[in-house]
């Protein structure tokens, strides 16, 4: 007696598009995690200890927002489904804040610290959190096939690794190519912000199955 074949829900290109979502995420996460301190201390001349304290305070807010957005996504019912609206809105905010984070205006040092904290918190605790929680939830929403879920995770990991490697080798070179200093960082951040937004839009075409509501 042969085993029953598990139903499949996704085409190969949908799996690829889903995995590419981690490329979009790492365009922002990778740039901030690996290079924002270099920009803030090396180019802007800000104090690393103060920056570290501001980041720590922001992480507290980030932990709170995880719960909030998880609840909001679960309660969302729209034409795009539960997850995709938050992924779209979140990525727009991520891309905007990523550019602004590497475009700190000239002025008093105090105002620069305030500017950094506000933009950094908006990026991480609001928009990135909304996008990433929705992105993770999308796996369970688009397929019930366990093998496909594993494949989605593999595609996601592959794109994350590739993106981090490429960024590790290219970011400082791009900064220098575009003039170095504040202008170089600003242009480089803009490039990755646009890439992240464009790639994230590919996920909008992955449909969440319509769920029937049974009235007893």
Where are these regions (language model features)?
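Hydrophobic alpha-helical segments, chiefly the membrane-spanning helices
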Residues: 215-216
